[in-house]
Amino acid sequence: MFSQRLLTQTSLFSLASLAASQSAIQFDGRVPAGTQLSAFDSENGLFNPSNVFGKNLTFSQLLQLPDVPPSLFDAGTVPLEVTISDQSIFAPSATNVQLGFRRAELLPASNNGTDPSTSGVKSLHFSLMKDTARPLNLSHEYQLAFVESNDFSTNQFVLKTGTLLDTATQGGVDPDSLILFGNVKQSQILFNTAFTEGVFHNFGLTLDFNANTTQVFYSTGNDPLAQVTEPLTNDISGQGQYHFGVLKKGVNGGADITKDAFQPSGINEGIIFGGIFQEDSSASTITLSPQAGANATAAASNGTAAGCTKKRSVGSIAGRLQYVRED
């Protein structure tokens, strides 16, 4: 089994060593305090201003800056809420109007589908919280965070809530849960937890695009992330783009759920996001909590859940664990 042992030898390492040990940030979607919603309607360096939202809408019409405490990794940055309404009908083209969906999603600005965020070994961070004033309709299935392959053929992972449409996986799963699936072509549940209100749910996903594995770290509130799975075999090939938001699927979809499924009227729903960023994990580390004098990180072990490469700590740099093979 995966194991780790922290050696408290931080005094042996210099500040220069600490600085050199920080993981590189691939993209950063944390919103600086004081940002105006109008900033999201044009190039802003955080999120793509053109996708994904309903025809004739803008992000400043559907985003909110909620009055909630910061999420785990928000320091000098603020949470951002994504909302949907009856007008949230995405139309990628004149012949592809998604009447069966209501959706609005944030895409990282630098994530064009073939950029390095979907190669090597990366750790994706995001937190999300319910808005009790804009509750979801849990008789529907929702996608809240996912990566869509560059050829649009699959989602390599997807975080869902609500009543699952896949009858093979919906049995025994409380609709009021956060359910993390691997590649939707396999419909494997990687992790699930109750979607309790009044608190941020924090996720760290270590995505090894070389080994095709996904490892899950999770916590609530201000608690540091904790490992909740081994690296699990999951096909994350195909590159693509990350989405954070609300994709509400209709019911009774027929042959094409995107166009034919039923959606009720009077929709006013939202999810609050915070702490969205991605770091490089090629050194087999993932940040578990924000820097507070020390950058607390832990191993993101290589391999699969069965027969994974074990690693052990052989030292630390101000809380940053260093690992070697333990075959």
Regions found by a protein language model. Give the residues of each.
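Beta-strand cores of modular interaction/reader domains in eukaryotic scaffold and signaling proteins
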Residues: 127, 179, 204-206, 215-217, ...
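Low-complexity, Ser/Thr/Pro/Gly-rich disordered linker/stalk regions
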Residues: 2, 20-172, 182-184, 235-312, ...
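Hydrophobic residues embedded in beta-strands of well-ordered beta-sheets
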Residues: 78-80, 176-178, 212-214
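Surface-exposed loop/edge segments in extracytoplasmic proteins
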Residues: 153-155, 187-191, 223-230
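Localized edge beta-strand/strand-to-loop motifs within extracellular or lumenal beta-rich domains
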Residues: 196-214, 221-222
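Juxtamembrane loop segments immediately following a transmembrane helix
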Residues: 207, 217-243, 249
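Short, aromatic/His-centered strand-loop micro-motif at the edge of beta-sheets
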Residues: 180-202
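Cleavable N-terminal signal peptides of Sec/SRP-targeted secreted and luminal proteins
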Residues: 3-21
